[in-house]
């Protein structure tokens, strides 16, 4: 069925992503994502917004300070062509965002600027460093991951493509 195919494709893609990046690569990416979230949490709170979550990895939700509306945040975000999450929980006072592996210093400062503008404040430029992680130890794994050789060999585009072609050649299906 289409649903099974869609799930299998996502699982296959995730497996190849893990194989391509390996344990060290995934840890580096995770550090990058979380560090960006930590910087955003710290800087946006300095503007008077209240962080609504105690533990986070990449997703933040902020309660808006008195006098700041979702519409003001939305308008400032749209000026920068950035989409944020606006909680429709009835209170109209929560805005969220998520970071990913592509976020950079410019985008971090743009996001901080959006929240500053909505609050009628200015924000200083912040430097983005990948070493700002503050993960709760209870959120961390204590076992080794991705120890099989496939996760430690194919870290170049050429190597990964050769590996994928090799898998394709070994495929035994009803189509051949």
For each of these PLM feature ranges, what is it?
Residues 1-57:
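Active-site C-terminal subdomain of aminotransferase-like
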Residues 1-12, 33, 69-88, 129-135:
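Flexible glycine/proline-rich, aromatic-decorated loop/lid segments
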Residues 4-13, 102-103, 171-176:
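Conserved phosphate/anionic-ligand binding catalytic regions in large, soluble enzymes, centered on
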Residues 25-30, 44-55, 87-89, 122-129, ...:
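Flexible, glycine/charged-enriched surface loops at secondary-structure junctions
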Residues 47-76, 99-101:
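Conserved PLP-binding catalytic core of the aspartate aminotransferase-like
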Residues 79, 85-96, 100-114, 121:
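Noncatalytic alpha-helical scaffolds and linker/capping helices
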Residues 105-176:
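Flexible inter-domain linker/hinge segments
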């Amino acid at each position: 069925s289409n649903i099974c195919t869609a799930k299998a494709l996502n699982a296959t893609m995730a497996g190849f992503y893990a194989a391509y990046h390996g344990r060290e690569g995934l840890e580096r990416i995770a550090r990058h994502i979380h560090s960006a979230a930590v910087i955003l949490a710290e800087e946006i709170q300095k503007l008077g917004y209240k962080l609504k979550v105690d533990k986070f990895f990449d997703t933040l939700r902020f309660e808006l300070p008195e006098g700041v509306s979702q519409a003001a945040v939305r308008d400032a975000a749209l000026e920068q062509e950035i989409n944020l999450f606006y909680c429709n929980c009835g209170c109209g006072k929560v805005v969220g965002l998520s970071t990913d592996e592509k976020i950079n210093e410019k985008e971090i400062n743009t996001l901080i600027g959006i929240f500053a503008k909505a609050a009628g404040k200015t924000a200083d430029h912040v430097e983005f460093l990948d070493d700002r992680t503050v993960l709760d130890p209870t959120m961390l794994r204590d076992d080794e991951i991705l120890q099989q050789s496939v996760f430690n060999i194919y870290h170049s585009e050429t190597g990964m493509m050769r590996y994928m072609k090799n898998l394709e050649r070994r495929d035994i299906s009803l189509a051949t």
